[in-house]
UniProtKB/Swiss-Prot annotation:
Gene3D superfamilies: 1.20.5.3600, 6.10.250.2990
Organism field: Homo sapiens (Human)
Places the protein is found: Nucleus; Chromosome, Centromere; Cytoplasm, Cytoskeleton, Spindle; Midbody
Effect the entry attributes to changing residue 40 to R: Loss of localization to the central spindle and midbody in anaphase or cytokinesis
Phenotypic consequence of residue 167 to A: Decreases interaction with CBX5, abolishes localization to centromeres in interphase
Location of region: SAH: 531-765
Assembly mode: Component of the chromosomal passenger complex (CPC) composed of at least BIRC5/survivin, CDCA8/borealin, INCENP, AURKB or AURKC; in the complex binds directly to AURKB or AURKC via the IN box, and forms a triple-helix bundle-based subcomplex with BIRC5 and CDCA8 via its N-terminus. The reported homodimerization is questioned as the SAH domain is shown to be monomeric. Interacts with H2AZ1. Interacts with CBX1 and CBX3. Interacts with tubulin beta chain. Interacts with EVI5.
Source species taxonomy: Eukaryota, Metazoa, Chordata, Craniata, Vertebrata
Regions of compositional bias (Low complexity) in chain numbering: 197-208, 384-394
Consequence of substituting residue 39 to R: Loss of localization to the central spindle and midbody in anaphase or cytokinesis
Outcome of substituting residue 169 to A: Decreases interaction with CBX5, abolishes localization to centromeres in interphase
GO molecular function terms listed in the Swiss-Prot or TrEMBL record: molecular function activator activity
Modified residues (Phosphoserine): 72, 119, 143, 148, 197, 214, 263, 269, 275, 296, 306, 312, 314, 330, 400, 446, 476, 480, 510, 514, 828, 831, 893-894, 899, 914
Protein name listed in UniProt: Inner centromere protein
GO cellular component assignments: central element; chromocenter; chromosome passenger complex; chromosome, centromeric region; cytosol; kinetochore; lateral element; meiotic spindle midzone
Length: 918
């Protein structure tokens, strides 16, 4: 068990704690995500496929993008298949109501989060959180002053409906008086129905104000004593909505709840109930449910409660929470009640159809009719007064409507259209949210466009086409009609006449009430067909309309039966799912109890096993000691036997190994002998092959030698021929040289003789000059001695200067030519020898034929460098440059140095003059 848990009790607590953490994690994280994903999937399959799942928040650019709404492939099962959407707001409201019906389970789960005892909040999905926020906004405190007649209270209900929130609309005394007057006027025109019909009543609930008509009608002063009369409009269920539906649904119904001020219209207006036009024309075709009950009267005190009701863990509350069985039963009852009414009122309906079609042709306006459709609509002149968007209160089947409930009539109609009031939503939006199970309904007459005669006839034909299209699979887009009403261009004259006619209907006239004005169009052709009269045509048309209406009734009955069957199937599925949920929870509880019992039993068994194990361990230890001693003896004996057997086995293995080694040695020797013989044979074969190759090589070398010898002899012959020619040339050159030397020698001898003769002449001339000079000096001395006192300058010109030419220079001997010196060594003061004009002649062996022969001989008989120079040792630069003196590091030369020397064969021009003497 571990050191932290000393006993089984702590382990149980630890297990409970871990289990609670796991369950909390599942409830607060995993199940929340799964519910949110399920809601988004349901919305995707019930709305359109173009919208992204909003599991994560969008970016602002995605959030503000407006996309065109498209009809989903998956249609609502409660929707009438041939009903067409006449306005965008109607479709939006129907989607909101269907979403409320689908997400009721999520809201009821949200209602169990917070209790009055301050229980811990659970994490919920974003849709449920939005619904909770909207519900809190509904329950926000508002000051109950006479200026604000709208406030929210909680309806006192029984145990089954205690989780629902009820918005209450309060009206003033003047509004109540006007409503009572209107009720009395309506009751004088036609009797009010005393029975409550929840399904059609919910359709007109937003357009009525609460007026008590039972016991309190006789005593209006009692009710006037109260300052405010709070009338319950309907129970408002907080449904989780997506961000689109939230802005249109709960927010509008909660924050913009208003009561339109009732202004009594003129008495002579055609829309007023007691006008003669209404009595004579519209009274026969007014619907029976012109005044509909919407709920019971409640207290005028407003009680503020928490928007989230406390949760109850009992199975009965769980059954009410997770199912819509009671609501679906009420829907089935309403449908059966409507079918019974239709069968009873078919004659009156056919008469009304005739009057309705005749008045439409006569007035070019729509007149309300009652043809047994899914809902009873108020007349066109009735305007919605209450702006709330109620829903049908959930009936659990245990409580029924009391017979003495107060009936609420329609408010006095306002002559202004409903679209002019900004606080009142459209009637299509109100009716779409009244009944969640019946699907979308027809909009009221005030929300429709005025239909012409041609459009009314074309719609009857379109209904037949829509019956055929009902069995086809749904498409992503509703096909547009061939000629929609918004694109019909009416003639100007007819349109102006219609406007004037409507103005005359809406304003009081001075004509007496018994007189009716004729508004029949005068644009028909004057020529009439004599074959059939107008009465016959009208009769045939009405007969066709009657047949079409009967077919429509049959089709609607089929639709109702299919709808009831589908609702029964949904109810059975939901009950089955609820039963499975309850069984699963019971199984979870049973598993918890069984797990606790198993853990306790396990710990008890563990303790018992521990005690038994201790006793058994002691007995086993004693038995083990005895068995160990016996075992040791057996082991020792077995060890000796095994050692003996091992020794014998080892000896046997040794013998086998020796025999095996002998066999291996023998095989190895045989293999070696075989390999030796094979190697010998191979060696002999290789030797023979080598000898053959050697013989071939020698033969080839011999042939090559003969070829070389022949080439050598040929070359020697050529060389001998060249040598002979060179010898002849040499001899001729020697002869020429001897002749030149002889000529030079003769020339030298002649020159020497001439020089000797010149020397003799010069010697004789010098002797003569010396004698003459001596004679002159003697004469001068004698003359000076004779005239010592006389100072006379005497210019004496020597006859030697003009007597003969100047003595020429002696002949220089030619330089001695050393035949062994070729001028290859230069002295330090010699200039570079010119290659084109060498200073010394090139020897004969270094030019011409001797040079070619010497090169050929050296090519074929290369000198042996090893014999000439011996072994050349590698240079050791360290040994060469081992001395180091300071002057070595100084540059003492006056030459031009370029350091470092350039790489390449080209020598720069600056280096060509670097060796010149300066």
């Amino acid at each position: 068990m571990g050191t932290t848990a000393p006993g089984p009790i702590h382990l149980l607590e630890l297990c409970d704690q871990k289990l609670m953490e796991f369950l909390c994690n599942m409830d607060n994280k995993d199940l929340v995500w799964l519910e949110e994903i399920q809601e988004e999937a349901e919305r995707m399959f019930t709305r359109e496929f173009s919208k992204e799942p909003e599991l994560m928040p969008k970016t602002p650019s995605q959030k503000n993008r407006r996309k065109k709404r498209r009809i989903s492939y998956v249609q609502d099962e409660n929707r009438d298949p041939i009903r067409r959407r006449l306005s965008r707001r109607k479709s939006r409201s129907s989607q909101l109501s269907s979403r409320r019906l689908r997400s009721k389970d999520s809201v009821e789960k949200l209602a169990t989060v917070v209790g009055e005892n301050g229980s811990v909040l659970r994490r919920v999905t974003r849709a449920a959180a939005a619904a909770a926020a909207a519900t809190m906004a509904l329950a926000a405190p508002s000051s109950p002053t006479p200026e604000s007649p709208t406030m929210l209270t909680k309806k006192p209900e029984d145990n089954h409906t205690q989780c629902q929130l009820v918005p209450v609309v309060e009206i003033g005394i003047s509004e109540r008086q006007n409503a009572e007057q209107h009720v009395t006027q309506l009751m004088s025109t036609e009797p009010l129905p005393r029975t409550l019909s929840p399904t059609p009543a919910s359709a007109t609930a937003p357009t009525s104000q609460g007026i008590p008509t039972s016991d309190e009608e006789s005593t209006p002063k009692k009710s006037k004593a109260r300052i405010l009369e709070s009338i319950t409009v309907s129970s408002l269920m907080a449904t989780p909505q997506d961000p689109k539906g939230q802005g249109v649904g709960t927010g509008r119904s909660a924050s913009k709840l208003r009561i339109a001020q009732v202004s009594p219209g003129p008495r002579d207006s055609p829309a007023f109930p007691d006008s003669p036009w209404r009595e004579r024309v519209l009274a026969p075709i007014l619907p029976d449910n012109f005044s509909t009950p919407t709920g019971s009267r409640t207290d005028s005190q407003s009680v503020r409660h928490s928007p989230i009701a406390p949760s109850s863990p009992s199975p009965q509350v769980l059954a009410q929470k997770y199912s819509l069985v009671a609501k679906q039963e009420s829907v089935v009852r309403r449908a059966s009640r409507r079918l019974a009414k239709k069968t009873a009122e078919e004659p009156a309906a056919s008469g009304r159809i005739i009057c309705h079609s005749y008045l439409e042709r006569l007035l070019n306006v729509e007149v309300p009719q009652k043809v047994g459709s899914e809902q009873k609509e108020p007349p066109e002149e009735a305007e919605p007064v209450a702006a709330a968007e109620p829903e049908v209160p959930e009936n659990n089947g245990n409580n029924s409507w009391p017979h003495n409930d107060t009936e609420i009539a329609n408010s006095t109609p306002n002559p202004k259209p409903a679209a002019s009031s900004p606080e009142t939503p459209s009637a299509g939006q109100q009716e779409a949210k009244t009944d969640q199970a019946d699907g979308p309904r027809e909009p009221p007459q005030s929300a429709r466009r005025k239909r012409s005669y041609k459009q009314a006839v074309s719609e009857l034909d379109e209904e037949q086409h829509l019956e055929d299209e009902e069995l086809q699979p749904p498409r992503s887009k509703t096909p547009s009609s061939p000629c929609p009403a918004s694109k019909v261009v009416r003639p100007l004259r007819t349109f102006l006449h219609t406007v004037q006619r409507n103005q005359m209907l809406m304003t009081p006239t001075s004509a007496p009430r018994s007189v009716m004005k004729s508004f029949i169009k005068r644009n028909t052709p004057l020529r009439m067909d004599p074959k059939c009269s107008f009465v016959e045509k009208e009769r045939q048309r009405l007969e066709n309309l009657r047949r079409k209406e009967e077919a429509e009734q049959l089709r609607r009955q089929k639709v109702e039966e299919d709808k009831r069957r589908r609702l029964e199937e949904v109810k059975l599925k939901r009950e089955e799912r609820l039963r499975k949920v309850l069984q699963a929870r019971e199984r979870v509880e049973q598993m918890k109890e069984e797990k606790k019992k198993q853990i306790e039993q396990k710990f008890a068994q563990i303790d018992e096993k521990t005690e038994k194990a201790k006793e058994e361990r002691l007995a086993e230890e004693k038995a083990k000691k005895k068995a160990a001693a016996k075992k040791m003896e057996e082991v020792e004996a077995r060890r000796k036997q095994e050692e003996e057997a091992r020794r014998l086995r080892w000896l046997q293995q040794e013998e086998e190994e020796r025999r095996h080694q002998e066999l291996l040695q023998k095989k190895k020797e045989e293999e070696q002998e075989r390999l030796r013989k094979a190697a010998e044979a191979k060696r002999l074969a290789e030797q023979r092959e080598q000898e053959r190759r050697e013989q071939e090589r020698r033969e080839q070398e011999r042939r090559e030698q003969e070829r070389r010898e022949q080439e050598r002899r040929e070359q020697e012959r050529q060389l001998a021929e060249q040598e002979r020619r060179r010898e002849q040339e040499r001899l001729q050159a020697e002869r020429e040289l001897q002749e030149r030397e002889k000529a030079l020698r003769l020339q030298k001898e002649q020159l020497q003789r001439e020089l000797e003769e010149k020397k003799k002449k010069e010697e004789q001339q010098r002797l003569a000059e010396r004698q003459l000079q001596e004679e002159q000096e003697k004469k001068a001395k004698e003359a000076a001695g004779a005239s010592k006192a006389l100072n006379v300058t005497v210019d004496v010109q020597s006859p030697a200067c003009t007597s003969y030419q100047m003595t020429p220079q002696g002949h220089r001997a030619p330089p001695k030519i050393n035949p062994d010196n070729y001028g290859m060594d230069l002295n330090s003061d010699d200039s570079t020898d010119d290659e084109a004009h060498p200073r010394k002649p090139i020897p004969t062996w270094a030019r011409g034929t001797p040079l070619s022969q010497a090169i050929i001989h050296q090519y074929y008989h290369p000198p042996n460098l090893l014999e000439l120079f011996g072994t050349i040792l590698p240079l050791d630069l360290e040994d060469i440059f081992k001395k180091s003196k300071p002057r070595y590091h100084k540059r003492t030369s006056s030459a031009v140095w370029n350091s470092p020397p350039l790489q390449g064969a080209r020598v720069p021009s600056s280096l060509a003059y670097s060796l010149k003497k300066h």
